[in-house]
């Protein structure tokens, strides 16, 4: 059994709503399900990627996880800001932010005349929470977010029990 799983380094940040769609997060979640301490790491860049800072961050976080462990069913989501002059601002423990996608579907036709739909869209950043993952990387900080596998909305359970199923 491995001592640690590091998923990534992913090209592009995994913040806000994107956590739900991320293969990088999913791979770390699988490790967590197997009882292996796991880290998902992403670089906030899609072009001109320089992974040198991300490699240093990954080694530091990995060492800390090996030395300190993680709670059961918990993984770390680490996002590294794109290379900025002067280096990173530091590390910030964050929570999942409110960045989401506004999806659009474009009707297209392939070379054989078959219709298909292409999903496109844009990122909507409504996040102003200074402790969120997206705000941290915009300010040059490495975002470290503890994620848990348990996604039940416990606050809603009692109300849901009153529904007439």
Predicted segment positions?
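Short glycine-rich anion-binding loops that position phosphate/pyrophosphate groups of nucleotides
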Residues: 10-13, 149
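Glycine/threonine-rich flexible loop motifs
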Residues: 13-22
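Hydrophobic/aromatic ligand-binding patch that stacks against planar heteroaromatic rings
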Residues: 27-32
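Short, glycine-/small-residue-rich phosphate/pyrophosphate-handling segment
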Residues: 39-68
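C-terminal accessory domains and tails appended to enzymatic cores
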Residues: 67, 71, 81-165
